[in-house]
Amino acid sequence: MGYQSEAELENKLIEKLKTQGYERVLINDYAELENNFREQLNKFNIIALENKPLTDKEFERVLNVLNGKSVLQSAIKLREKIDFDREDGTKIYLKLLSENAEDNIYQVSNQITVQGKYKNRYDVTILINGLPLVQIELKRSGIDINEAINQIDRYRIHSYRGLFHYIQIYVVSNSVETRYFANTDAQRLLKSLTFYWTTETNERINKLEDFSSSFFNKARLLKNVIRYMVINETDKNLIVMRPYQIYATEALIRHALDTGKNGYIWHTTGSGKTLTSWKCANLLSKEQSIKKVFFLIDRKDLDIQTKEEFNKFEKDCVDETDKTETLVKQIKDIDRKLIVTTIQKMANAVKNPKYSKILDKYKEEKVIFIIDECHRSQFGEMHTTIKHHFKRAQYFGFTGTPRFEENKSQNGLKTSDLFEKCLHTYLIKNAIYDHNVLGFSIEYIQTFKGQYDENDKTMVEGIDTDEVYMADERIDLVTNHIINNHKCKTVNGKYTAIFATSSIPALAKYYDKIKSLNSDLKIAAVFSYGENEDLEGKDEHSKDILARIIDDYNKEFDTNFSLETFAAYNKDITNRLKIKKSPKIDILLVVNMYLTGFDSRPLNTLYVDKNLEWHNLVQAFSRTNRVEMASKPFGNIICYRNLKSNTDKALRLFSNELEANTDNNPPIWIIPGYGYFRDKFKELAFKLLSIAPTVQSVDDLMSEDAQREFVIAFRELSKIKSILTTFSEFSWADVEDALTCQGYEDYKSRYLTLYDFVKKERNAEKVSILDDIDFAIEVIQTDKINVTYIMNLLRNVDTANKKQQAKDLEHIKQELDRTDNPELRR
């Protein structure tokens, strides 16, 4: 059977939507879109309008209210009422949406043509009450779905205006792969923020027909638009929740309303638990049967990152003071149903007799406690105190690494002991499969002489003493390995790293060694210390170590911090490690800080010289696995201790596969080794050569189909090359039987030339199949053009063939135009 064309796919989807209760409506252009909106607005508000449709002037006033807004402003307006005086003096309130699915009018149209900077036709548009709220772009089977995303990007820039700013959700599909994502005012759409829709048990729904049955169910679509979109006024964007976040929210709310029991959500680290927990708290606070919802966090976790995260969802919602009295005032306020506070303040309020009169009012009422990152907090210790007071309270915890029998807490408690039932799971294997977090490339480096067996505990773990691990020879070996390999691990320093050490003395020794080598790496260190620590066996007090490290930091980054301004110092480190502030920190040395709860997309590498197991291991590794762009395909973990067994057990436990045998089926969370990517590079290089046997032959690819084939082949090759170069053992000699380094650079140059032509020089009025192709340009790490490179090009000029010589010289001219080397600019 042949490929289904886009037109066939479009018609099939429309017929499917008609069976789901959508009315087919023909809308040819923007004027007809406005006319249809007017008709549906009148129908939807028939009671408020007392059966008197809007006059021309009144509708014009409605359009004036709705138009001229950004995507974010439009989303806010969509959820509000429009109030104005009618021509006869009557005051009315018009609604644009109803939370009751059956109250709304659902329509579907296709091929709406809009003339903006260029003329564009939109594939399929879903309208609710006449407003275009969902836009669907389709590609035929076999076409990369990213091309549909790029097409939407063009539409947003060139022709979306007015009512099209009310689009909340985009859907892209090639019939066998389907994704959805939120609209945005950002200049470019991030492909990392496009999501697969799934079942409640995290099974992906890829086929467009199945996706339509679930996602475009009218009640589900309305919930996804109204309940499960978040207006982030801090970052000025829309957030659409992912399916597992939605299902977890619904499961928790059902459990809270239908039972009096507790529960917990197990969603892997990095999957967006804070948003899910916040949404649960927000929705529960709107239920009449619930008197108060307390969102509890630990005082020590109320850092800058936590405050930023919470304030994205509701501005100024976090009370940063340590005053218990402030909390009690909030509890006393009957109109304030949702309270964000710390576990410590809540426990203090309950224990203090002077607040009993206020708190006793809720002793027998239904109240909800939601605990984010429930195992990072002291909730277990204070649970009894709080529970003793609130007799009908329900407790809901969120965790990425639950406590089981294997890793129960110091007091012997498991997650189920505190929170009873697990209500929803989204495990690390699910998140990696869905591309919501990255997998790990793990290297175990031998740091002791003799034959190293990663499964032989007697070689490393059996001699776990400070004397051995902190020997000068070993410190030198580890330090030099880090310095020699850091650039390849971090893509020439594009990304940042954390170095986890076993103790403050170990950190100090590594810090001093790196400093003494005068590398060009910018390093920093941070740790907490005890004022009255035992100095036996130590050369230096931890406080003094930190003081001199801060002095170094001030010189390196032109700052003025001290021990007294530790919080500001820590904040500055956070910003530089996240590359929010320049210059960035290349490597941050830590002991325990930053190994849990720290989220940074630009962090891609963790060096480990400490023993880790179970939840501590997964939490530490997960600092590196936030999705960013194609140049960050995985998190790099470099272990200088024998953590192989601990890693396997921990990752299996938190993927619910502790007993699984993965000998024949490698786990999804571990990236294949160097050999796999070396062989893959060769395979793709030979494929590239079958399309363009020589660099010059790229110029002879006259048809757009042939050019497209070349672009896709080189793009895939470049992705593997970017992975290969992160391995310390990589050498071009290993792959030169397929393609040499110079050959790769030459093909890359032609690739970039074609990219420039498509993006900058092509006549924009002419439709091209190359318009929306994904060049994945971020993985083509363009090194600075140097003299050696240009000389190699000159040596390869074909002087015998005048036509080819002209092409070669033109190519060299283009390369010179790219350079910022003044020696070549002259």
Task: Identify the role of each PLM range.
Residues T268-T269, E373-S377, H389-K408:
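Conserved helicase ATPase motor motifs in RecA-like P-loop NTPase domains
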Residues L338-T385, Y569, I573-T574, V590-N592:
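Conserved RecA-like ASCE ATPase "motif II neighborhood" in helicase/translocase motors
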Residues K207, N407-T496, Y510-D520:
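Interdomain helical connector at the RecA1-RecA2 junction of SF1/SF2 helicase-like NTPases
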Residues R154-S159, R376-Q394, S622-T624:
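Short, conserved "post-DEAD/DEAH" coupling segment immediately C-terminal to helicase motif II
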Residues K337, D466-V590, S749, T753:
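Conserved C-terminal RecA-like helicase domain
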Residues E15, T19, L54-T55, K261, ...:
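Catalytic cores and motor modules of nucleic-acid processing enzymes
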Residues G2-K292, D301-C317, I334-K337, Q344, ...:
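ATP-dependent helicase/translocase motor core
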Residues Q344-K345, I368, Y529-I668:
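Conserved RecA-like P-loop NTPase helicase motor core
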